[in-house]
UniProtKB/Swiss-Prot annotation:
Protein role: Envelope protein required for virus entry into host cell and for cell-cell fusion (syncytium formation).
Name of this protein: Envelope protein A28 homolog
Membrane-crossing segments per the record: 1-21
A Pfam family of this chain: Pox_A28
GO BP term, example: membrane fusion involved in viral entry into host cell
Topological category with respect to the lipid bilayer: Single-pass type II membrane protein
Species of origin: Amsacta moorei entomopoxvirus (AmEPV)
Virion surface side: 22-143
Protein family (similarity comment): Belongs to the poxviridae A28 protein family.
Length: 143
């Protein structure tokens, strides 16, 4: 045998030994690995098979806003109508009125944190309008 063959045999033997030791270590700790996976499986990220699932941790419109008044939030009136509000105004489907109202806070939050392009309606261009008074009331109740 020449030196090249000896080196190849040593390399293959080392690789197989390493593989055997890894498999042995895995088999020895199999119960611990299963317990670990059961304990911490809720912390791992997984894609959902549900098409309608919105991962609210991925997109947050408040990530780059540092002023508390400018952060978007869901606020409700006394009659349980929810609005997505900020000092910029209301989220709406058009820029001429409040067209997005919600019957529960969950729907408001899902719509607020979705990636859909949103239109902001600023009612306070006319300071005396009813919509501007509603916005100020909602902002006073949530800040």
């Amino acid at each position: 045998m020449n030196t090249v063959q000896i080196l190849v045999v040593i390399l293959i033997t080392t690789a197989l030994s390493f593989l055997v030791f890894q498999l042995w270590y895995y088999a020895e700790n199999y119960e611990y690995i299963l317990r670990y996976n059961d304990t911490y499986s809720n912390l791992q990220f997984a894609r959902s098979a549900n098409i309608n699932f919105d991962d609210l941790t991925v997109f947050d419109p408040n990530d780059n806003v540092f002023n508390v008044e400018e952060k978007w939030r869901c606020a409700s009136t006394n009659n349980n109508i929810f609005y997505a509000v900020s000092t910029f105004g209301f989220l709406s489907t058009e820029s001429t009125g409040i067209n997005l109202t919600y019957t529960n806070s969950r729907d408001c939050i899902i719509d607020l944190f979705s990636r859909i392009i949103k239109i902001v309606y600023d009612p306070c261009t006319v300071e005396t309008s009813n919509d501007c008074r509603l916005l100020r009331l909602l902002m006073a109740n949530t800040s």
